[in-house]
């Protein structure tokens, strides 16, 4: 929504109901395209870029926000749960970056890629080992792609690391009042973030204001990492 408020037309990829998001974006006077598929499907990145360019004529910004987790202790995780998380959070994310970068190169003029990492990009967690592994890797490959694409193609690849956020994914944690209270003591701002808190960082990284920022991860965490 924040990018639409800043003037961007939006392409949303996923299988969940997006009617509320679509209404908000159209109310802002921006165009909206929904592509009903999972980013982890084979050939999805190429198809997503193709449909985007067919509709809007070009691609300027990629935000990799898809993510899943499995809440299992490390001693109990099985290969399927491990691989399911890595397929969406890391493998699909990289190939979306690759497909977008190829389109940026074809267009000329560069482009902006924003990957969504996590505070677990910096530290371990509990019961989320494949998620932690994937998000640490996202931070690392963000730097790697910057190294290869910055000067040669003028492609900016940066990352946002959210802290504790009120989302569907964190609902199990938030259902435990004692866990919520304990977590708030570890956040200097003493509250969980909401998705709207990420808008400023996303707009900055998508805009010309960040033209000399590349390969970096911005924490939007209420100060959590500062206190850790």
PLM regions and their residue ranges:
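Active-site helix of classical SDR
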Residues: 97, 134
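Alpha-helical segment proximal to the catalytic Tyr-Lys
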Residues: 102, 147-151, 211
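Residue(s) in the substrate-gating loop at a strand-loop-helix junction
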Residues: 118
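Short C-terminal tail/terminal secondary-structure segment
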Residues: 123, 189, 202-203, 214-228
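Substrate-binding pocket helix/loop in short-chain dehydrogenase/reductase
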Residues: 73-74, 78-86, 179, 183
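Short, small/polar-rich loop/turn modules that mediate ligand/substrate recognition or access, typified
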Residues: 151-156, 213-215
């Amino acid at each position: 929504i924040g990018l639409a408020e800043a003037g961007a037309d939006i392409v949303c990829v996923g299988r969940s109901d997006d009617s509320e998001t679509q209404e908000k974006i159209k109310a802002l006077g921006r165009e909206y395209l929904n592509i009903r598929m999972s980013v982890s499907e084979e050939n999805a990145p190429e198809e997503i870029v193709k449909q985007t360019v067919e509709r809007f004529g070009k691609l300027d910004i990629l935000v990799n926000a898809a993510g899943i987790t499995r809440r299992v202790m490390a001693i109990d995780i099985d290969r399927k749960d491990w691989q399911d998380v890595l397929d969406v959070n890391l493998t699909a994310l990289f190939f979306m970056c690759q497909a977008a970068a190829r389109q940026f190169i074809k267009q000329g003029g560069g482009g902006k890629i924003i990957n969504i990492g996590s505070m677990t990009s910096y530290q371990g967690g509990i019961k989320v080992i494949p998620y932690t592994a994937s998000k640490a890797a996202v931070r690392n490959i963000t730097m790697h792609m910057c190294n290869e694409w910055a000067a040669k193609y003028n492609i900016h690849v940066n990352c946002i690391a959210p802290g504790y956020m009120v989302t569907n994914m964190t609902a199990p944690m938030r259902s435990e009042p004692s866990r919520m209270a304990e977590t708030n003591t570890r956040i200097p701002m003493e509250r969980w973030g909401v998705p709207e808190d990420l808008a400023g960082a996303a707009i900055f990284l998508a805009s010309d204001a960040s033209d000399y920022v590349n390969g970096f991860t911005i924490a939007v965490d209420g100060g959590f990492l500062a206190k850790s």
